[in-house]
């Protein structure tokens, strides 16, 4: 009798357990089915877009990755090397945030030699450039005011610019003569190569006389510190990404180069940091060509797959993502995407870096799908006669991703 009761209780417990588990299993099965249907529908829609006659005469590279599920969703020519245009700024910014960190600052520092006698500085001034593209009027006049506070009415020596932060090349490798890019110099005033001229003027407005003699020299190790002005990395990152500012991108690029501690650091040293991260992500750095930090160069060639790898890396590293994501243009709202995707599902649900050079339009970043999955995508259209045709295709892809 006791065995009968035990057997009955065991069967009853099993039935109750099955009833308890089955609803959850059914829900999980339903969710899995919905996920598969979503993926199938997304891929079918992308297939339809990629069947456009546009690609009979142009080249397409497309890669879509589901960051939430950590799986590849869709690819077309994802390993074909193409010109990234300004989506190169993604690799520059992600590498910089990885190497420099979110607390890095862009600094310009003021030093002097000699001593102050009878309100005359019997020595020289040195402005040490740190390639800060945001250095402006307030910063310059703060320098002049600090000198005035030293009790200086006159400078007997020379005003030196220390531009040893980077090499002496004024433009990037492979830039076109008609790009109209700003000159690359470690000492900038409002983004222009006119620092020392404006510094002499600011000193004069503070009542500090000088002979106006300027030159270039490396600041002596025993020079006396006066003050510095600095801007946070986010202050550089926002214009670089939102407005695709090439000068800001090259400044970020050369911050990497300067980490070597070598005077007159070159673009090659910055490239080595990016190549190092490429290898860390499991790719062969020799399969790609990187010439600058902005994407202006004719010599830079990447793949959509590699850009996705960088976007995935940033997403998985919160100290990077918390700086990168807010800096990206928002579809239909701001930056270089302000006038694109102003309606539909993609509106406000896409944050991505745009790119355009002759015959090339690109777009890479993040899209929030309707099922709350975060997607990373990279689209490169190459061989375009009219860039608008590529951008229209990209916007259509984003609309599909956000459905």
Tell what function each PLM region has.
Residues 289-403:
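C-terminal soluble interaction/assembly domains
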Residues 57-59, 77-79, 85-88, 103-105, ...:
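Extracytoplasmic
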Residues 70, 84-102, 159, 198-199, ...:
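Active-site SXXK
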Residues 61-65, 73-75, 124-128, 158-162, ...:
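Soluble periplasmic/extracytoplasmic beta-strand elements of cell-envelope proteins
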């Amino acid at each position: 009798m006791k065995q009968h009761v035990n057997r009955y209780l065991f069967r009853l417990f099993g039935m109750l357990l099955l009833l308890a588990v089955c609803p959850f299993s059914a829900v999980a099965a339903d969710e899995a089915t919905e996920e598969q249907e979503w993926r199938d529908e997304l891929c079918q829609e992308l297939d339809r877009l990629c069947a456009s006659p546009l690609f009979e005469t142009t080249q397409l590279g497309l890669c879509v990755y589901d960051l939430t599920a950590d799986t590849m969703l869709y690819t077309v020519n994802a390993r074909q090397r193409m010109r990234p245009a300004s989506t190169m700024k993604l690799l520059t910014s992600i590498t910089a945030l990885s190497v420099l960190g979110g607390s890095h600052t862009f600094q310009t520092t003021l030093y002097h030699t000699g001593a102050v006698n009878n309100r005359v500085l019997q020595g020289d001034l040195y402005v040490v450039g740190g390639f800060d593209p945001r250095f402006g009027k307030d910063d310059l006049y703060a320098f002049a005011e600090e000198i005035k506070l030293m009790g200086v009415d006159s400078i007997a020596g020379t005003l030196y610019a220390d531009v040893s932060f980077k090499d002496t090349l004024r433009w990037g490798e492979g830039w076109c003569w008609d790009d109209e890019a700003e000159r690359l110099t470690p000492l900038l005033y409002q983004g222009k190569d006119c620092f020392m001229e404006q510094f002499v003027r600011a000193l004069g407005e503070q009542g500090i006389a000088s002979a106006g003699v300027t030159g270039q020299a490396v600041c002596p190790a025993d020079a006396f510190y006066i003050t510095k002005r600095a801007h946070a990395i986010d202050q550089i990152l926002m214009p670089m990404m939102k407005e695709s500012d090439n000068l800001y991108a090259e400044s970020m690029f050369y911050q990497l180069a300067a980490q070597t501690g070598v005077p007159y650091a070159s673009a090659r040293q910055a490239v080595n940091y990016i190549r190092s991260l490429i290898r860390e992500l499991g790719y062969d750095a020799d399969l790609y060509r990187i010439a600058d930090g902005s994407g202006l160069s004719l010599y830079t060639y990447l793949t959509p797959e590699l850009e996705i790898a960088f976007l995935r890396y940033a997403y998985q590293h919160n100290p990077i993502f918390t700086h990168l994501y807010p800096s990206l243009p928002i579809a239909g709202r701001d930056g270089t995407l302000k006038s694109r995707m102003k309606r539909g599902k993609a509106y406000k649900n896409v944050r991505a870096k745009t790119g355009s050079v002759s015959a090339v339009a690109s777009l890479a970043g993040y899209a929030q799908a309707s099922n709350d999955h975060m997607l990373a995508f990279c689209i490169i259209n190459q061989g375009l006669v009219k860039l608008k045709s590529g951008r229209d295709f990209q916007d259509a892809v984003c609309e599909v991703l956000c459905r």
